[in-house]
């Protein structure tokens, strides 16, 4: 339990930041799912546009350390590989 005023304030700030970070992580997951959904539908153009949007979200989240930068790089790499494979198979 926070006893000092400073500790109480930090607890309030952490709660607020936790909620914001959770929404940012959710946005990352939603963006990735949108790409995977368009890949399953074999829609190359939709996957490309969703990928460009997801890259922005991933880079912002990684820059703010909401997700690890290596995880963002890994996701971008794997998703671009899947899009490339879809484009080459069509």
Swiss-Prot record:
Disordered: region residues: 1-27
Keyword Ribonucleoprotein: yes
Keyword Transport: no
Keywords: Ribonucleoprotein, Ribosomal protein, RNA-binding, rRNA-binding
Cellular component terms (Gene Ontology): cytosol; small ribosomal subunit
GO biological process: one example: translation
Pfam families: Ribosomal_S20p
Matching HAMAP family: Ribosomal_bS20
Protein name stated in the entry: Small ribosomal subunit protein bS20
Native source organism of the sequence: Coxiella burnetii (strain RSA 493 / Nine Mile phase I)
């Amino acid at each position: 339990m926070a006893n000092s005023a400073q500790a109480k304030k930090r607890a309030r700030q952490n709660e607020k930041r936790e909620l914001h970070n959770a929404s940012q992580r959710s946005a990352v997951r939603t963006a990735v799912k949108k790409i995977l959904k368009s890949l399953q539908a074999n829609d190359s153009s939709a996957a490309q546009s969703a990928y460009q949007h997801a890259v922005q979200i991933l880079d912002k989240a990684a820059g703010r350390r909401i997700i690890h930068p290596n995880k963002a790089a890994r996701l971008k790499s794997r998703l671009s590989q899947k899009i490339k494979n879809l484009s080459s198979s069509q």
